[in-house]
Amino acid sequence: MVRKIGRRARESSPSSTSSTLPADFSHSEMHRHIATSLAALTSSGPLPGLVVFDLDYTLWPLWVDTHVDSPLRRRGSDINKVYDRNGQPLSFFPHVPAIMLWLKRSGIPIAAASRTSAPTVARQALNGLFLVDDAHLLTSATDDDSPEKPSPAQSQPKVVKAIDLFDYQEIYPGSKITHFRKLHADSGIPYEDMIFFDDEYRNAEVGSKLGVHFVEVGHQGTDLGLVEKAIREWRAKKAARAKAEL
């Protein structure tokens, strides 16, 4: 396997305006906080037609063609974790599961656009990463106006496979322009209604050439603050276009 030099291609990538969460937050508390914050965002304006993620250093903190060795497999009932053949673990960045589950619950299609030279390994990761969708239970448990408590069956958290959250996958070497032209052709969604999260600024060309709203991801990966900021910026662009058309 060819090894890349250094931790990532662009260490100077800026950090996001991340919403700071207490260090001692449990998984459930963090999930609830993110779900509540994003629910407020849902009710405050329009939402994008498609949210697209790069994979390496955007959803997880490594290069799958460099830092892990195939095959990647889940162990037992582990959540948000797979291991390579040497026992090296891979997980999503902390906020990513709750963000992706919110997108799915909100009816916003999700796509992957990655130029990795190891697409099979990337799909092994997405197939092996299982997530717990318990945000709706956490919300109802703290809702004093709720007329009734959930039944025992409803109280069981739902476990979902990460790959099943993606409506579209463009995972292969090449240009992100090629990826997005395919996403546009397959989905019928206008470029200007797409938001793209990626850690490499060179891929901002999808914005200048196609009109996609590009969001550069910093060293912390995709997180709540970055998503909130991205949607607000996308809304501002949308409003400006509408005003210009009057």
Region spans (language model):
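Substrate-recognition element of Asp-dependent hydrolases with the DxDx(T/V) motif
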Residues: G87, S91, V96-L129, Q169-I171
